[in-house]
Amino acid sequence: MEPSMIVVTTENVTGYRTVRMLGQCFGVVVRSRGIGGNFIASLRSIVGGEIHEYTQMLEEARRHALDRLVHNATSMGANAIVMMRFDSAEIGQTMSEIVAYGTAAVIEPAR
């Protein structure tokens, strides 16, 4: 992630004023577990409890979606993303889509 990009889930950034809203930006990742991972996960689902293979995959997918969101906002000329959210969906039976989205903005320190 770009070190100069501020990403918040709120509408405003404390201590900053919004100069310009640039519009919607997003980062999308679609992931699929391999056959081996699905097999191990299905065995674990019989016993119950956390399925670490899927947890790790989804954590990694969120990080990649956030990186893509920041890249998208940077290419728009933003130095901040406000109202950032994650969303997810299943595509078929073997794939997960993770979307990070928000509003790209230009902000500056409040006077």
Swiss-Prot record:
One Pfam family in the UniProt entry: YbjQ_1
Family: Belongs to the UPF0145 family.
PANTHER family: UPF0145 PROTEIN SCO3412, UPF0145 PROTEIN YBJQ
Stated name of the protein: UPF0145 protein BRADO6695
UniProt organism field: Bradyrhizobium sp. (strain ORS 278)
